[in-house]
């Protein structure tokens, strides 16, 4: 669940908004935005700061979601679980085995982001022209169970510990 939960919506646009949470202090808190089972959603030119559990999570058969020109950051208020973006919330195939087509374009992960930029189970994920400026991040991109990633023309600043960690997934990377 999220501070803002978008459930079962179709043809929905979120644009030019700032979402600021109290800080990432535990895994049991809310996401700033939780997209649940919605289709044809566009999130554009938004900023996400200090989500409790995550900044923007996309789950439960959401489909055809585009996140563009957004920024994600965790400040000093976030001392645990600074994991920004999750796609599919569990290993259960009903989460989105044939859904979860998600594009991340021209986004910027800034300081404090440690992991899940994004992490996905299932789905087809396209990442292009994104900027990872998050020194100290444990790992940026996490393809997981049965997900397919197309990763194109992304830039990773110095100081990122691991750019990529893959588990039971397919990823194609173009530089």
Task: Walk through the language-model features, giving the residues of each.
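Right-handed parallel beta-helix
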Residues: 2-103
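Short catalytic-loop micro-motif centered on adjacent basic/acidic residues
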Residues: 42, 55-57, 116-119, 139-142
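A generic "binding-loop/recognition-motif" signal
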Residues: 10, 39, 52, 114, ...
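Generic hydrophobic/packing signal
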Residues: 30-32, 107, 117, 162
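Aromatic-anchored, glycine/proline-accented short structural segments
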Residues: 81-136
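A structural signal for beta-strand register positions
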Residues: 18, 47, 71, 106-110, ...
């Amino acid at each position: 669940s999220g501070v803002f939960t978008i459930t079962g919506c179709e043809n929905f646009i979120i644009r030019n908004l700032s979402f600021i949470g109290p800080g990432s202090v535990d895994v049991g808190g809310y996401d700033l935005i939780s997209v649940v089972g919605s289709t044809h959603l566009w999130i554009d030119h938004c900023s996400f700061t200090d989500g409790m559990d995550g900044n923007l999570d996309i789950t439960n058969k959401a489909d055809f979601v585009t996140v563009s020109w957004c920024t994600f950051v965790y400040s000093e208020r976030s001392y645990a679980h600074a994991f920004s973006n999750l796609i599919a919330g569990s290993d259960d195939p009903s989460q989105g085995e044939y859904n979860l087509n998600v594009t991340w374009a021209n986004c910027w992960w800034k300081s404090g982001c440690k992991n899940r930029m994004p992490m996905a189970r299932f789905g087809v994920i396209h990442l292009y022209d994104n900027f990872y400026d998050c020194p100290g991040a444990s790992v940026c991109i996490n393809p997981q169970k049965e997900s397919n990633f197309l990763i194109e023309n992304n830039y990773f600043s110095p100081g990122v510990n691991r750019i990529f960690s893959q588990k039971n997934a397919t990823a194609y990377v173009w530089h």
